[in-house]
């Protein structure tokens, strides 16, 4: 299939963008890529050959709306870039008064919070830059850099009747080791990405589409096009079918909204039978009948759902992760399966690491009106918030913390992001990059080792419920 239409100059300009402004927003700062745990160079013939030899099935699940610091901020494991290891960080109650009161990250979060943080594009702008409509040119040249100081203030703008301390508990709080035991198992046993960012600084559907297509097709909100299969760009589903790669979208949405494969006009016209109930996944995993690509939609987004999207419980989401892992681990496909657990976006929760700039996927822009009435146009030239992401298989290194990757188009040090999945799947299944964003995304093929581990747990630790916000 053809790649999505793009600006021809984007690939050529990517080097200068990353050279002039650092990965995390401060001019001149450079970071090193993480040394390969197995000696493979990402994207090299040897690494790709090993990936193809070891991995025959991929299971990919996007959970919902949690930042790295929110989920892993209280996990005391060496190497994790989080508040419990590095010290708590603070936000002003009012970004316009830097000398005023501040509130800090803390070991105080809720299994579910009542007030969903703003995760629109202009909401993210305020949380990252302290203003709804920052100057795009100044962001690109480094005159304005993200400080991630606006989370408490934005929560108070969204919910003016709550106290500042409750606002901070909701958006700055993080979970303790005891509250996320299932996820700690994954950290201890497999590979955790320290710096993995969402595709765009915006809400759910554009981020899910961008993860699946390498572009949100110019969409920056959860508009009605996603519900009527009106996204016309190529996706991993269309691409897989064109390469005779078997796939299923296991649908756990319970009819609340369409599963992600049905964002696309092509799927609605050609592959509706590839969408099956989520229950089928567990029987297919245990029976050894999984397709080459399994894409899982969790339930979302209120009480008694398992995506972790507020006000769904984090404990329910951990149960979902455990169910997926346990089924794959106990099934015959474990020996050749790569399980990727990530999130769609950071959901308006605080994270102390600013988001990097990024190569635009195409020439499209998106304009929205902010809470204060300002108009802002986004050019899809920077990533969204940092999110937890785990690589799980019989071949991933035990307890590995992966920091930075390498931009395959430029050789520059680069943070991982949602489109790193498409880049890696392209290496595995021999399909072309769908957009320039994918072409500039680090792959993670080098994290698959040459020998199957014999010490992976048969099951993950179950979570326990803990108090909700009210």
Regions found by a protein language model. Give the residues of each.
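Fungal secretory targeting signals
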Residues: 1-27
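N-terminal pro-sequences and low-complexity stem/linker regions of secreted or lumenal proteins
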Residues: 23-470
């Amino acid at each position: 299939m053809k790649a999505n239409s793009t600006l021809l100059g984007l690939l050529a300009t990517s080097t200068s963008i990353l050279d002039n402004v650092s990965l995390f927003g401060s001019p001149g700062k450079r970071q090193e890529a993480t040394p390969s745990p197995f000696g493979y160079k990402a994207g090299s013939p040897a690494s790709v050959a090993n990936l193809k030899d070891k991995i025959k099935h991929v299971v990919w699940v996007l959970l919902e709306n949690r930042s790295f610091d929110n989920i892993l901020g209280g996990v005391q494991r060496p190497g994790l870039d989080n508040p419990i290891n590095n010290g708590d960080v603070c936000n002003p109650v009012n970004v316009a008064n830097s000398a005023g009161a501040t509130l800090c990250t803390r070991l105080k979060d809720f299994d579910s919070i009542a007030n969903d943080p703003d995760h629109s594009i202009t909401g993210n702008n305020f949380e990252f830059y302290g203003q709804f409509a920052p100057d795009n040119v100044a962001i690109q040249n480094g005159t304005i850099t993200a400080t991630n100081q606006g989370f408490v203030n934005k929560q108070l703008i969204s919910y003016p009747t709550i106290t500042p301390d409750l606002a901070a508990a909701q958006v700055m709080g993080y979970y303790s080791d005891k509250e996320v035991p299932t996820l700690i198992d994954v950290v201890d046993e497999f590979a955790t990405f320290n710096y993995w960012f969402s595709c765009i600084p915006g809400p759910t559907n554009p981020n899910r589409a961008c993860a699946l297509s390498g572009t949100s097709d110019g969409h920056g909100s959860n508009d009605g096009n996603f519900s009527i299969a009106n996204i016309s760009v190529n996706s991993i589903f269309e691409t897989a079918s064109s390469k005779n790669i078997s796939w299923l979208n296991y649908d756990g949405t319970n009819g609340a909204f369409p599963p992600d494969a049905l964002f696309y006009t092509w799927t609605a016209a050609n592959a509706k039978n590839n969408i099956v109930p989520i229950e089928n996944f567990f029987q297919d995993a245990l029976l050894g009948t999984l397709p080459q690509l399994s894409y899982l939609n969790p339930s979302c987004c209120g009480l008694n759902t398992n995506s972790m999207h507020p006000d769904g419980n984090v404990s329910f989401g951990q149960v979902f992760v455990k169910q997926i892992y346990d089924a794959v681990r106990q099934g015959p496909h474990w020996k050749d399966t790569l399980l990727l657990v990530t999130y769609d976006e950071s959901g308006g929760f605080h994270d102390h690491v600013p988001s990097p700039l990024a190569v635009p996927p195409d020439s499209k822009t998106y304009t929205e009106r902010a809470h204060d009435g300002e108009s802002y146009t986004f050019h899809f030239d920077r990533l969204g918030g940092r999110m937890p992401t785990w690589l799980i298989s019989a071949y991933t290194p035990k307890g590995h913390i992966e920091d930075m990757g390498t931009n395959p188009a430029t050789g520059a040090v680069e943070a991982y992001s949602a489109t790193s999945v498409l880049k890696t799947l392209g290496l595995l299944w021999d399909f072309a990059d769908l957009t320039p964003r994918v072409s500039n995304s680090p792959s993670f093929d080098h994290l698959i080792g040459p020998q199957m581990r014999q010490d992976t747990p048969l099951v993950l630790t179950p979570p326990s419920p803990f108090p909700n916000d009210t």
